[in-house]
Curated annotation (Swiss-Prot):
Compositional bias ranges of the Low complexity kind: 145-155, 394-406
Signal peptide per UniProt: 1-17
Keyword Isomerase: no
Biased composition (Pro residues): 122-144
Protein name: Uncharacterized protein TP_0369
Amino acid sequence: MSVWVALALLGMCVSCTHVPPPRALIVSKEPPPALDSAPRPAIPEAVPLPSPVEEEIAGRLPPAPAAAPERVPESSQEREQKPESSKPQVVEPVSLASPVKPREAGSVPDVLPVPEVSSPHVAPPAPPAPTAPRPHRPSPPPVSPSASKPKQRAVPPSPPPASEPPREAEVQAEPEPAEDSPRAMVPEEPPEDEVPRVSRAVQLAVGQKLEVLYPGEGWVYVGEHTAQPGLRYHQRKLEESHSLFTFSAEREGDFVLAFSYFDVFRGDFVSDALAVKVVPKREGLARVVRAPEYRRTVSSPPDTVVSELSPAGTGTERRAEESGTSGSQRAAAHTGAPVRQDQTDTAVAEKAQHGTPRPDEKKDREPTVGGRDPVPSDAVAQGVSERYSPRKISPASQPSAPSAAPIEAHVPASAHKEGQEKRDHLAEARQFCAQGNARDALASLGDFFAQFPSHERMDEAWFLRGQAYEINGAQRNVRLALEAYKTILERFPHSPYWKKADERARFIKNFFIKIS
């Protein structure tokens, strides 16, 4: 390698130093000689030196095999000296169309045998190793199908079971809880299938609203017992520590409204029901009807009527003595039995002994529809089924012979008079307002408020009072008129006069800057 590098450097130096002499100083007329056309020596190309990494890799590689010597072409004499057997034989192709010629003796076969080439470097295949002969096993004898089945073992008979003692009943009756245990203190809810006890009844027409008032805040509405449409439930609200339920009549029929209340002192549920009869729609009736008031009695004698049909808005419980009849007479009235003379005399004597109640104490009167026309008690009682009766009458108090005694005989005559007085007061006040007579209108309304403080047409009375105070004259008072309209807006949200009262109240607030 170093020799080649030295030669390359020497050639480069020679080519650089071979410069012809300057000819500018030679003055000669002869043309300059031609440049030397002799070929210059070829400069060998520089071979890059291998890096140490390449040398290390080249040292690990195996040596390259030696190149095969070049074959020298044979001369014509050498070809002639070769034996004929070494010359290649040419096999003529045989066409399928031409017939096959028979072979001659001593002719060369069509297919030459391929001589076996034995290489001294290839070892002959080793013979297989001898295997040990397997021992001979005798074949098992043939098995018959009967012998293939497994033999069943003989099971000895089990001894008869010994008589076991009778076991006790798995389900035993649970012991009743003690009175002081927590389980005994938990109240049981009333069964759903139990028929509620009807304590009151009310009648209203289609389109009217029904208000049911219960004392206390724990009352809830359970549902309609007959499960028929026609009476729609609206809401429950608290009004001065009382529960007020609102319904509306949409279809005719007889309904039973069930209510429930939990008494914390007794630890039991109190159930109550209200019988409602919806009649066809009528004109000129009040929009809201108040159901009779609920009064619960702890204990009552057999001849006491727990609940009576009372007018809308003032229903009470009364005993047989208040109406001047005994329990036997009331039972006879409901069952149609005759009343003996001695029973009537006894009732009259009891009435004279206790005294006749004053008119202001008589709160029981006949049911009315919207406070307009009195409804006979037999019409209301007819709408209530016999199974909803509040109490069964003992057989001892039932006479034997039937009779037709009307129920209206036990209703005080003052009930009809009171209903007439209510209509007269409001009719007079309306007439006086139409005539512009505010003094007489306010006087009639004052008598109405004093005598009937819980009438179902109280909203109409308050509206007439506001109208009377707006009449021009000595009685004009805008502040009192505004208070009357506000009373309707706050206490009677379902009143038919609510919209008119709201309009008048807005008018007074907008057009009167200072109300004195």
